[in-house]
From Swiss-Prot:
It comes from the Archaea. It is found in: Cell membrane. GO terms for biological process: proton motive force-driven plasma membrane ATP synthesis. This is A-type ATP synthase subunit D. GO terms for molecular function: ATP binding; proton-transporting ATP synthase activity, rotational mechanism; proton-transporting ATPase activity, rotational mechanism. Pfam families: ATP-synt_D (PF01813). Has multiple subunits with at least A(3), B(3), C, D, E, F, H, I and proteolipid K(x). Keywords: ATP synthesis, Cell membrane, Hydrogen ion transport, Ion transport, Membrane, Transport. The gene is atpD. It comes from Methanopyrus kandleri (strain AV19 / DSM 6324 / JCM 9639 / NBRC 100938). One of its GO terms (cellular component) is plasma membrane. Belongs to the V-ATPase D subunit family. NCBIfam families: PRK00373.1-4, V_ATPase_subD. It is a peripheral membrane protein. Its main location: membrane.
């Protein structure tokens, strides 16, 4: 056979049964992986839409924050903004968790405050309302950027999983299953050959036995002096 088959295969009935089980299992696995691949692709494109919306929101919030910062600088001056910024002593802290999306572990990214809250409220008693508005706007912008980072990392991980699943589907479809099926045909061919050879061998043995019986019968007839049958 010119097709590729499994190495060191033993053409027996037992091996054929085992191979047929492997083919059935491989086909089931191929079907499940195709379903997983298709579901991942659908989920991926849904997330692409969401990522586009979140990206627009993040850009919008950043622009608003910088606009309000510019307004605050006009009100209290650049030095006043810097002093207020240093006075807060606030650091951005991020909590990174995880969740499962279609079998893919993806991150959950959240900004947290010292007391574990999910929001940090900026307030300055001796500063202008414009500066407070700028700080709140930057807080919202940071949240939007973190959300964008979360979904973009999720997209990256899902894209990798889609590629891995595609490779496994292609390997099963174009290499593993054809090789198993070619091996199945090879074993069936060998078993057919063995059956034909056994049939010929048995026929020869039968002919030999019949000839031996005929010879023994002729010898017995001769020894007994019996008359040989006439064929005239």
């Amino acid at each position: 056979m010119t097709q590729e088959i499994l190495e060191d295969v033993n053409p027996t009935r037992m091996e054929l049964l085992k191979l047929q089980d492997r083919i059935e299992l491989a086909k089931k696995g191929h079907k499940l992986l195709k379903e997983k691949r298709d579901a991942l692709i659908m989920e991926f494109f849904e997330m692409v839409k969401r990522a586009s919306e979140i990206r627009e929101q993040a850009v919008k919030k950043l622009m608003e924050a910088y606009s309000k910062l510019a307004a605050a600088k006009v009100t209290v001056g650049e030095i006043g903004v810097e002093r207020a910024s240093m006075a807060t002593g606030e650091e951005i802290k991020v909590d990174v968790g995880s969740r499962n999306v279609m079998g893919v572990v993806v991150p959950i990214i959240e900004r947290v405050s010292e007391d574990g809250g999910s929001k940090v409220v900026y307030g300055f008693a001796d500063t202008s309302g414009a500066l407070d508005e700028a700080m709140r706007a930057f807080t919202e912008a940071i949240d939007a950027v973190l959300e964008l980072a979360e979904i973009e990392e999720t997209l990256r991980l899902m894209a990798e999983e889609i590629e891995r699943t595609k490779r496994r589907v292609n390997a099963l479809e174009h290499i593993v299953i054809p090789r198993l099926e070619n091996t199945e045909k090879y074993i069936e061919m060998k078993l057919d050959e063995q059956e034909r050879e056994n049939f010929v061998r048995l026929k020869r043995v039968k002919d030999l036995i019949e000839r031996k019986k005929l010879k023994e019968e002729l010898e017995r007839v001769v020894e007994e002096g019996a008359e040989l049958p006439s064929f005239e």
